[in-house]
C-alpha cells in the first residue's frame, strides 16, 4: 500500500515544507555584495516607478558623473532594470544568479584565506575594475555627453566570468533550450544583436571587459586565443588564475569602509575590559627556593621554563634532569665532615 502523500493545504502549516525559505530568509541567504546589487536594483525600480526620484539620475553620463561628481551613476547605471516587465525580471534574475555564484565560488572563501568582512574584497575589486572598464570604453565610443544604461554590459561581463567556471555545465536557455555554459555568453550576444540592436554594443563591451579580466588574471591571451591557436593545454587562458590580485591599497580602503580594520582593536579592547580575575594568565605557581639549593622537580617548573625551552633542550631527554640531589648550602660555607666522607 502506498504511503501517505504530502498534501499541502491553503490553511495551517501541517504540510509546510521546511526547505522553502521565506522572503527574509531568502534575502539573508544572498551573499553581501550580491544582496546590495539585488536590493539596489529593486529599490531603484520602485522609486523610479513612483516618481520619487527621476530615473535620469541613475543613467551614466561621463560629464555629469565626473565633472559634477555624481559618482553613484557608475553603479546605478549597471543595475537599472528595463521598463518592461519580462526583460526586467530576466535582468534581475541574471544579476542575482550570476553574481551570487561568482561571490560564493569564483571569488568565494574556499579559494582564499580571507575571513570575515574581508572575504568579499576580491569580488569587490573585480566589480570595480569591470565597471570602470565598461564606463571608460562606453565614453570612448559614445562620447562624454551621451546618456547610456550599462545593465546589459554589466550582465554580459559577469556572465562571461561565470561561464568560465561553468563551461561544461548544461543549463536551460530561457528554460527551453539546453546549452553548455561556455556558449551562454555568445548566445546572449547573438540574441542582443538580433532583437536589441541598441544594447548590442554595450553587451559587446561587457563581454570584452570580462575577457580582458580573464587575460589579466591568467597572464595569457585568453581561452578564445587558445582555441584559435589550438593550444595543447585545454586549460590555457582559464587556469591557473589569481594573478591579477587585489592591490594592498584597495584592501586597506575596503577594510576601512567595512570596518574590518577594527576587528583586531576590538579584540584587544575586549580583552582589556575583562576583569583580571577572569583572564587566563600564565604565572609561576611553584615553590620558591634560595640560591644554591637543589632545583625543584619537573612538575613544579614546567609552568614557566618548559614554555621557554628550546628544541635542543627538549630533545636532550632526561639527561638534563639528572642533577645534584644532595643537600643545599649557602654560598661560602665549607663542606661538613660527613659530606667529605
UniProtKB/Swiss-Prot annotation:
Q: Give the signal peptide as a residue range, or say none if absent.
A: none
Q: Where is the composition biased (Polar residues)?
A: 276-286, 296-341
Out of the domains of life, which is the source?
A: Eukaryota
Q: What residue ranges are annotated as transmembrane?
A: 42-62, 123-143, 171-191, 193-213
Q: Which residues lie on this side of the membrane: Lumenal?
A: 63-122, 192
An example of a Gene Ontology cellular component annotation for this protein is: endoplasmic reticulum
> Keywords assigned by UniProt?
Endoplasmic reticulum, Membrane, Stress response, Transmembrane, Transmembrane helix
What name does UniProt use for this protein? DER1-like family member protein 1
Gene this protein is translated from: DFM1
